[in-house]
Amino acid sequence: MSNKVYTKKGDDGTTSLLSGRRVSKTIQEIKSVGSLDELNSFVGLLRSEILDVNGIFETIQWNLFNAGSMIINDNNTELTEVTQDDINSLEEAMDLMNKELPELKNFILPKGSRSVSTSHICRTIARRTEIEVLECKVLDNFIKLHPISMYLNRLSDYFFVLARYIAYKEEVKETIWKN
């Protein structure tokens, strides 16, 4: 791989799928990959703010890259995929954190320290990206992309629990939404 980042091939509004086939940057798959990249960048920011004790953030980042490659895999190249095991790992991590957290009885406002707020940003980007991936199903990709949308759904939940957990450990009081 060269250090040269620019190729000028995308100047016409197209990009390459895994096969090399050129497609418009405006198709849903490419929008989804862009959102996965955005989420991955914010996970990287979160990693810079709190200790990645068991390596879960790095695993999440790899899974987000894997999800992006699954989306643009138009020639069935064998790839590392997001699996049910990845979803189970998120659920196990949430269960461990939830054991220490007080019961949630109301909606809470997304606020707190920088790491709490960054976790909430990751949560909302994951939720939006899940919806964008689901929109790809109209392009006959639903079976292939279903594990990705499930993973993103769980990932959004994970970042919500993580935000609460960080706030709890930092002794930041949650602000209950008053309706």
Q: PLM features: residue spans?
A:
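Phosphate/pyrophosphate-binding loop motifs in nucleotide- or prenyl diphosphate-using proteins
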Residues: 1-179
